[in-house]
Amino acid sequence: DIVLDTDGKPVNNGGQYYIIPAFRGNGGGLELTRVGRETCPHTVVQASSEISNGLPVMIAALPRTMFISTAWRVSIQFLKVPTCTPKPSYWHIPQDSDMEGSVEVRVDERFPLEFRIEKVSEDAYKLMHCPSSSDSCRDLGIAIDEENNRRLVVRDGKPLLVRFKEANQDSE
């Protein structure tokens, strides 16, 4: 299946999108924040404000096709990040995080294909983490940490349901 955005258009391979919740009522889009001892935002969280779209991401797959398919592993990277944040800001799940399975951004020269988008219903998708060493994928959901951040983490059976909103230059 081709992944569709909030306007019903195919999600472009290499396109820029906001990842927003499929259903209102629990926070906004996905963005970066500082947690714990981080001096610079590295950790992927859901915005606390429902009206926030979060930060735009680029979603890319290796097959040189125009659109993103649910069959492929993709890389996800934030595009507009603070100066101190490593670039390119690819999503990654480090082994040494303070919260197990927490999605963070790290510099990765390898173009990491660690994620998949799966259709859940007509207007909702879920993000999954697929470690490169394995064929199995696990749901990404929200866990609230001790600082009340809504962190994006591996949560089997409790996925965050999302949609993809095109990040137009004029809708900043």
UniProtKB/Swiss-Prot annotation:
Protein name: Factor Xa inhibitor BuXI
Record CDD domains: beta-trefoil_STI_LlTI-like (cd23365)
GO molecular function: serine-type endopeptidase inhibitor activity
Cysteine-cysteine disulfides: 40-84, 130-137
UniProtKB keywords: Disulfide bond, Protease inhibitor, Secreted, Serine protease inhibitor
Compartment list: Secreted
Source organism, top-level taxon: Eukaryota
Family: Belongs to the protease inhibitor I3 (leguminous Kunitz-type inhibitor) family.
Function: Inhibits bovine trypsin and chymotrypsin, and human plasmin, plasma kallikrein, factor XIIa and factor Xa.
InterPro entries per the UniProt record, alphabetical: Kunitz_inhibitor_STI-like_sf, Prot_inh_Kunz-lg
Reactive bond for factor Xa, annotated site positions: 64-65
A cellular-component GO term for this protein: extracellular region
